[in-house]
Amino acid sequence: NKIYDVKDLSNSTIKDITFFHSKKYEFLASKTKASFCITTENLKHFLPKKCNKIIVDNVLYATAKITNLFYPESINDDFDISAQNILKTSFNKKVKFGSNVLIGKNVKIGKKCSIGHNSIVEKNVIIGDNCSIGSNVIIRNTIINNNVHILDGCVIGKKGFGFFPDKIKNYRYPQIGVVIIND
């Protein structure tokens, strides 16, 4: 079986891997459609027989590691600003860019927009018409609709969900959702 995505118990399909870390979710675990589930020895019996169980000591840690394989942290470390990097990226009329702006693949920027100095717009971001993005802004996994103004220094869609403990230290839980900002 191939795994195509990481999803929660209730939204997973046969192509997904999910996780089950607390008995309070047993009603969802018994109905999951995921082909694979990360869980503990104590919880595995709540899962459907057709679901392949991956038994671990720390479910959240294992899920974070797998999620990072599907959703790498950031493009910032290996950002290539060559012309080939912005294939399939579209800029409409009258878009203004400050200096040192980085634009990822498959970005769509509407009409009459401005993006301030030192800002990063990562791949697959959509920015509507008449938007202004301040300086030193990072945007990831975001849809910005028309007439939105983002102030200097904002970070949108980068980190979320906080931390969870392991035996040695705390780990950041990966963010895989999309932020939608309306006017």
Feature roles, as predicted:
Residues 1-84, 112, 147, 153-154, ...:
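Terminal amphipathic alpha-helical/low-complexity segments used for targeting or macromolecular assembly
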Residues 19, 83-183:
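Structural signal for interior beta-strand "rungs" in well-ordered beta-sheet cores
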